[in-house]
Amino acid sequence: MYTYMEYLQKCFYKSTNWNEDNIYSNITATSQALLDFPIPNGFKIDSSSKTTDYSASSFTLSNHHQINGSLAYLYSSIPLTNTMGTKDVSLQDAIAGFRIIEPSVGLRSKLKNNIMSNRSSLLYGRMYFPGSALEAMIIKRLTKNSQLLIKCVNNPHLEKNGTMIVYLQNNTAKYSRELIYSTNEALIGLRCLYNLGDATSHNFTNINPAVIPKFDNSVVSIGTEIWYAARTMSPGLSAALRYSTRSTSTGKPLTMTLAINPIVGHVSSTYTVKTSVASTFCSKYDFNVFSYASNLSLGFELYSYANKKKNSFPSFEHHEIHSSSEENKYLKKHPELQRHHNLHHNLHHQRVPIKSHKYEGNRTIINPIQNLDNVYHINPTLLSSNGSTSTTTNNENTNTSETVTAAFQNLVNESDFSSVFKFSTSLNDKVVKILWEGRLKEFLVSTGVKLSLNPITNTPEFNKLGISFSYAL
């Protein structure tokens, strides 16, 4: 679960159209949210308030080993009007989970329409007690596509009483670059991330789009980072590949990543798929080419809908549903299929509660694929009888597939969830993590446990156990 200050920072990025998914450090963010999620330790309560649209404060108190806490302040040069308190915020925005990667064409349009991003800034500071530890962060937008990020930590237990990290970031639709400097070990780093291909470059004029492609909105990102510690003369290098796509027949997204560290010989691959609106599955395989050590990690998250009298799923109750024009033309030529078509549509709408985009008032385009559970099942009414496909048919089928993709994403965003259950395990480490996060009255609650197997007695033991309450106005 995000802290309130982290939530405000993400709202600041959304207000200024800064794409976090286009940063190299977030290339494996989806798998980390499902496998490496933190477990609360002890008791913690967080009370926050946004006094104005430009400023907010937060107070945290916990009893881990001893009574301690912190006091934080945040200021934004632009109004953060897209924020909500813990009573009204959706769990999709308050909890780290599956992240849908958008094609570069969508990112380009967002950045092009950006008006408020230039010269915007965000200031954040936190003071811990007891003790004299301080942390601060400054975000300064230099241009529409570049910003300066500074993070500072002041702690008497650190060398020279603290450290500072400076990020100079350039983020465009096609690529992102970062130049990083840290006072710790005089560390210098360079990160790059490139998005291959373009959503507008696909050409299927000679192929029926009802047959292929079965996946669209695909994004292939490749990146690398190079580090050099000037004091110890130690290098660092890693590379990563991310492939994200969404099925055109079901709209379900999936993400695959491959990360390599050639210096230590570590290879890591992940596969994450959103199996339904309320569930996600993730797997991760680690391998070392030098020691031949390997590890398999599995995890999933399962959302629960809020208890309501009506069905939590959006429905077609107030929408006029119609098929695509190409399908109607085919049915007129083959009347024997009309009865089967009508019967199937009735069963289809009762079984799959997916709300699509609206067109011309209350008209709604439905999915032309007959069986949403089978991504390889093609509706024959969409296939041309003579094997040729016109430009109009191409556009209609493309728009329909985009509608199905957008419908699934809208259904995820608009669903009213009350809680989420997360589970992850590692076969080699023999560790099990269980986390429950949800809404209790006007509070957001996070509680979980981390279990491991004692190598001597072979009995389970608790590594972490705690509960956290968060309240924000």
Swiss-Prot record:
Keywords: Membrane, Mitochondrion, Mitochondrion outer membrane, Transmembrane, Transmembrane beta strand. It is found in: Mitochondrion outer membrane. Transmembrane segments: none annotated. InterPro entries: Mdm10. GO terms for biological process: establishment of mitochondrion localization; mitochondrial genome maintenance; mitochondrial outer membrane translocase complex assembly; mitochondrion-endoplasmic reticulum membrane tethering; phospholipid transport; protein insertion into mitochondrial outer membrane. One of its GO terms (cellular component) is SAM complex. Its main location: mitochondrion. It comes from the Eukaryota. It is a multi-pass membrane protein. Component of the ERMES/MDM complex, which serves as a molecular tether to connect the endoplasmic reticulum and mitochondria. Components of this complex are involved in the control of mitochondrial shape and protein biogenesis and may function in phospholipid exchange. MDM10 is involved in the late assembly steps of the general translocase of the mitochondrial outer membrane (TOM complex). Functions in the TOM40-specific route of the assembly of outer membrane beta-barrel proteins, including the association of TOM40 with the receptor TOM22 and small TOM proteins. Belongs to the MDM10 family. Lacks alpha-helical transmembrane segments, suggesting that it resides in the membrane via beta-sheet conformations similar to those predicted for other outer membrane proteins and porin. Component of the ER-mitochondria encounter structure (ERMES) or MDM complex, composed of MMM1, MDM10, MDM12 and MDM34. Associates with the mitochondrial outer membrane sorting assembly machinery SAM(core) complex. PANTHER family: MITOCHONDRIAL DISTRIBUTION AND MORPHOLOGY PROTEIN 10. This is Mitochondrial distribution and morphology protein 10. It comes from Candida albicans (strain SC5314 / ATCC MYA-2876) (Yeast). The gene is MDM10.
